[in-house]
Amino acid sequence: MIAKISDLADVQGGMVLSRKEAKNQKQSAFEYSRLTLRAFDENGNINRSELEIFHACESLENALFTKVGDVVIRLVSPMYPAYIEPGYENILVPSQFAILRVKGCAGIIPEYLRLCLAQKSVEERILSLESGTAQKTVKIKTVLDLEIPLQPLHIQQQAVQIDLLSRKRECMYRELIENERILTEYLIEKMIGGTNQ
């Protein structure tokens, strides 16, 4: 079965932060962690060290913050969709992003929605629909109109598990390669008599 994203999830664009920004830190009554474009990686992870502090002049609405179960996308290509897990909630979402919240009876799990949005074919479809824009921006309407395959829940869960295991393996391989590089440098330095002797 094929379903439109608009039938499966509510989509809300992030907030234009310049309207709520404190003129200086002394006027700042509220501080929030906020998403940045570089905080998202191609695997759907959010890098905490790339989040920024936003100083607001007033309290901001809860609807503009991440919640567990949200799928957040960048509104520039590539979208790098991310599933919000525990520990990543209450992060301010600026206007360069959109939040997708699965509707209660939609028959889709949020992790599967993220997985569908992360597919190369979806990214290519979005790029072809947004071809007139020079900066490769993604309109919320384009996302709402996307059609994705809606599999039975057990298939969705299996696909999510396969993706999760694959991403864990990739992370372990990267760590192994880095450790191998460090070991090789150390051994070569020892063999040729490096400066640290």
Please identify what each model-predicted range represents.
Residues 1-26, 150-197:
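Non-catalytic DNA-recognition/assembly elements of restriction-modification systems
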Residues 75-115:
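A short beta-sheet element
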Residues 109-132:
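Glycine- and charge-enriched low-complexity intrinsically disordered segments
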Residues 60-61, 87, 133:
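A structural connector/turn signal
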Residues 6-23, 40-68:
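Sequence-specific dsDNA recognition surfaces
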Residues 24-32, 52, 64-66, 84-96:
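Short, surface-exposed loop/turn microsegments at beta-strand edges and helix-strand junctions
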Residues 70-73:
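Generic structural signal for buried aliphatic residues
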Residues 91-97, 132-158:
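A short glycine-rich beta-alpha junction/loop motif
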